[in-house]
């Protein structure tokens, strides 16, 4: 049983998934900081410092905290926008890298053979 578990745990997919989960957790902290520390204060300035989370309605002595719900919706959209912008930048960087790699022409078979012949002739003359 231990051997089966070890084989399962050491498969590439499981390790890749574990790395993805750890990186995802770290990335979550970055996105949350971007939203909470940068976007939310800017939004607060734009909307006049209103804090939705404190809004509530009392119905028959029971507080309905609809403000927190609104705050979470705003946070969701800000996180979605932040992720969109981050992915957009990453995709652009990848496209630029692909264009650079495509711009470097790979030598044809003839060019490779000529290069080998040249190198052999150089070695002979030394």
UniProtKB/Swiss-Prot annotation:
Keyword Membrane: yes
Key word Transmembrane helix present: yes
Listed SUPFAM superfamilies: Gated mechanosensitive channel
Gene3D superfamilies: Large-conductance mechanosensitive channel, MscL, domain 1
PROSITE patterns reported for this sequence: MSCL
Superkingdom to which the source organism belongs: Bacteria
GO (cellular component) term, any one: plasma membrane
Membrane topology category: Multi-pass membrane protein
MF terms in GO: mechanosensitive monoatomic ion channel activity
Subcellular location: Cell membrane
Keyword tags: Cell membrane, Ion channel, Ion transport, Membrane, Transmembrane, Transmembrane helix, Transport
Entry-linked InterPro entries: Mechanosensitive_channel_CS, MS_channel, MSC/AndL, MscL_channel
Main localisation: membrane
Transmembrane regions listed in the UniProt entry: 8-28, 70-90
Function recorded in the entry: Channel that opens in response to stretch forces in the membrane lipid bilayer. May participate in the regulation of osmotic pressure changes within the cell.
Subunit description: Homopentamer.
PANTHER family: LARGE-CONDUCTANCE MECHANOSENSITIVE CHANNEL, MECHANOSENSITIVE CHANNEL MSCL
Record-stated family: Belongs to the MscL family.
Protein name: Large-conductance mechanosensitive channel
